[in-house]
Amino acid sequence: MAVAEFEITSSLSPSNIFKAFVIDFDTIAPKAEPETYKSIKTIEGDGGVGTIKSITYSDGVPFTSSKHKVDAIDSNNFSISYTIFEGDVLMGIIESGTHHLKFLPSADGGSVYKHSMVFKCKGDAKLTDENVSLMKEGLKKTFKAIETYVISHPEAC
């Protein structure tokens, strides 16, 4: 098992960044970061617990697809947990990756985005520090792209 965490500050309020990064991710991510996200589709559910989504990644990304299931979502406290359970994004060595996201208010009126990841590896497989670093950097890049998109398109929230 491998665990990784990071946090990023944002000028956007917790409610605005939660809406963009969680509720409207399916439509905003391909617009904000088309070099990473080709499409995101809901396979099952309505966005709540149990919802299953499929992500198709753009050409140039080192993997093509992933599927994840929403484990918990709390719109009042701006948090979500989901588990990636399928796709080459798991690199053949990860059985599943559970992500916990929380958006907290900051003193300046913005927010702090906290993200923790727990990876269950297959058999004796282990994630390298480089693997974990690449995942963290990719997620940070996506967060900043969505933040920039929302600032440029305030009607999105």
Swiss-Prot record:
It comes from the Eukaryota. GO terms for biological process: abscisic acid-activated signaling pathway; defense response. One of its GO terms (cellular component) is cytoplasm. SMART domains: Bet_v_1. Keywords: Allergen, Pathogenesis-related protein, Plant defense. Signal peptide: none annotated. InterPro entries: Bet_v_I/MLP, Bet_v_I_allergen, Plant_def-hormone_signal, START-like_dom_sf. One of its GO terms (molecular function) is abscisic acid binding. Pfam families: Bet_v_1. Belongs to the BetVI family. This is Root allergen protein. The lineage of its organism: Eukaryota, Viridiplantae, Streptophyta, Embryophyta, Tracheophyta.
